Amino acid sequence: MMLSTNGGPASPTADGWVNYAIPVIAGLMYRDSVEIDELKHPFRVESLGVVADSAGAGRHRGAPAQEVTYTALENPVQVVIPCDGQFAPPRGVNGGHDGTPGSTHLIDHNGHTTKLPNLVNMHIRKDQHIRGRDSSGGGYGDPLTRDPARVLTDALEGYESIGKARDIYGVVFTGRIEDDSLAVDAAATKARRAELGSATKTRGRDPAAE
């Protein structure tokens, strides 16, 4: 089964593709239907979606990671899971931030979570869950140079939080997502980026030179 695809890397001209998967697929992979897989196999998908704040930040953003959680409907159910990329996150380029590594966890009935290795061949019970997360994409270029309008779109799409927009991209908003009033505060954004840029230079790195 293939229910999710890891996020693709940013490039000098574009953000990473959410449906990138691996280079040989080039975004053209057909993902399984959750409903059909649930009809064919003794399991239920509890959640499937992108992971907020997982993407590698940059002038062009890497694609966010995707996460799926599922449980068994019978006792026991065998699962075989390959999960590469748990130790070396996708790298950012030219000042872009690294993406986040993949992971697989077993969740017991009491909520206790156990991290699983790269390759798993095991049985799970009806009261257990598997949570798998793909890698996200690394960013390209310094985040402080990203178009604030793109950061706003990312926040509205749920790819980036308002906190990450402020702390990493230096973009400040007014309004709220809930009532469709979220907007870029241009003056506050200019001041915030100047503040973050000054702090970066103090640490020995100049975004303007990248």
Please provide the spans of the model-predicted regions.
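Glycine/proline-enriched, intrinsically flexible loops and inter-domain linkers
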Residues: 1-209
